[in-house]
């Protein structure tokens, strides 16, 4: 299981959503930490500009959660959770 590091902006943005949404995001991020294959490349100008070319994303409850993986899969890997954006804002 990878170590998770949450950015301040992610924590602040997530706090704006209701508890069921926050819980769904936490559950999805647990999957991300346990399974390296979860998520897709974050494509698009907004995503690349905001989170970097190497960012990945997962969709949950109408949100895109952006993150980056570093290190070899397993206990030496770190997942940096960068931000959460409503999908309607990206399209």
Q: What kind of region is each of these model predictions?
A:
Residues 1, 12-15, 23, 55-91:
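Enriched for short, Lys/Arg-rich terminal
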Residues 1-4, 29:
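Detector for methionine-enriched segments
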Residues 5, 17-20:
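Residue-level signal for short amphipathic helical patches enriched in basic/charged
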Residues 14, 18, 29:
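Short amphipathic alpha-helical/adjacent loop interface patches that line ligand
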Residues 19-22, 34-38, 63:
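Generic structural signal for secondary-structure transition and capping sites
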Residues 26-36, 73, 78:
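A short beta-strand-loop micro-motif that forms or neighbors metal/cofactor-
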Residues 31-59:
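A short, surface-exposed loop/turn module that caps and links secondary-structure elements
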């Amino acid at each position: 299981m990878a170590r998770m590091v949450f950015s301040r902006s992610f924590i602040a943005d997530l706090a704006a959503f209701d508890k069921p949404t926050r819980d769904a995001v936490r559950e999805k991020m647990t999957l991300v930490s346990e399974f390296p294959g979860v998520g897709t490349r974050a494509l698009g100008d907004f995503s690349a500009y905001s989170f970097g070319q190497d960012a990945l994303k997962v969709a949950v409850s109408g949100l895109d959660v952006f993150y980056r993986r570093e290190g070899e899969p397993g206990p030496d890997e770190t997942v940096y959770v960068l931000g959460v954006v409503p999908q309607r804002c990206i399209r």
